[in-house]
Amino acid sequence: MNTKEISKVVDLVRESNPLVHNITNVVVTNFTANGLLALGASPVMAYAKEEVAEMTSIAGALVLNMGTLRPDEVEAMLLAGKSANMNDVPVLFDPVGAGATSYRTEVARHIPAEIELAIIRGNAAEIANVINEKWEIKGVDAGAGNGNVVSIAKQAADELNTVAVITGKEDVVTDGERTIVIRNGHSILTKVTGTGCLLTSVIGAFVAVEKDYAKAAVAALTFYGVAAELAAAKTVEKGPGSFQIEFLNQLANTTSSDIEKYGKIEVI
């Protein structure tokens, strides 16, 4: 797997304009929709239990994000996830804040037990808590802690039979056999709320057009990181507000050639 190979997935997304169904949180809905549109995908946010199964059946991917967790949303996620499994629609799960509260952790473990996942994406603490490994977490945005990130990712991939994506200063993608580290991105991403949640949805757009889910995830992470670097180069001295706007621009303007030129991936 190399940058030339993965760069082609970006073009596929823009050619295909995949529909990505997001059951996500109230904090990030607008940013997620705008980010997907900028990339070249089509976002939809449908939460009502009366329609989620039908909406999911026509989508290219389903993204489940438990950032602002409510019982009715959990019910909708389960209905949508089961519809996705029945209709061969890949499911991506973002267990935001797993480990922060007992309820949140319970839901984060229940969803993978009920739904077959294509991708699970979170920080190290969240993924560790989903698979019941000890890792301290403070709030839904915290990922710092002690432990071997690659080991946790491989364990999650094996136990959940999925592709595990752990994001942080360096990003790790593994299907349990292949493991890839991506070293793109910029620290200013942590100053804008919703960048992690949008990332999961962007991976969803890539998964919708590339059935090798590990390859799709690596392509999405590299694209996202390069776009962040290009945006930061123009705006980091101005601050996160300017960066957020320019980042949307770069999601639209970053090309497959940029990924080949600036992508930093390593198969380990």
From Swiss-Prot:
Matches recorded under SUPFAM superfamilies: Ribokinase-like (SSF53613)
Plastid is among the record's keywords: no
Pathway listed: Cofactor biosynthesis; thiamine diphosphate biosynthesis; 4-methyl-5-(2-phosphoethyl)-thiazole from 5-(2-hydroxyethyl)-4-methylthiazole: step 1/1
Molecular function in Gene Ontology: ATP binding; hydroxyethylthiazole kinase activity; magnesium ion binding
Disulphide bond pairs: none
Protein name: Hydroxyethylthiazole kinase
Gene3D superfamilies hit by this protein: 3.40.1190.20
EC id: 2.7.1.50
Any GO BP annotation: thiamine diphosphate biosynthetic process
Gene: thiM
Cited Pfam families: HK (PF02110)
Superkingdom per UniProt: Bacteria
Record: residues binding ATP: R121, T167
Alphabetically ordered keywords of this record: ATP-binding, Kinase, Magnesium, Metal-binding, Nucleotide-binding, Thiamine biosynthesis, Transferase
Claim: Kinase is one of the keywords in the record: yes
Catalytic reaction list: 5-(2-hydroxyethyl)-4-methylthiazole + ATP = 4-methyl-5-(2-phosphooxyethyl)-thiazole + ADP + H(+)
Cofactor(s) demanded: Mg(2+)
Broadest EC class assigned to this enzyme: transferase
Record function comment: Catalyzes the phosphorylation of the hydroxyl group of 4-methyl-5-beta-hydroxyethylthiazole (THZ).
Family label: Belongs to the Thz kinase family.
Positions bound to substrate: M45, G194
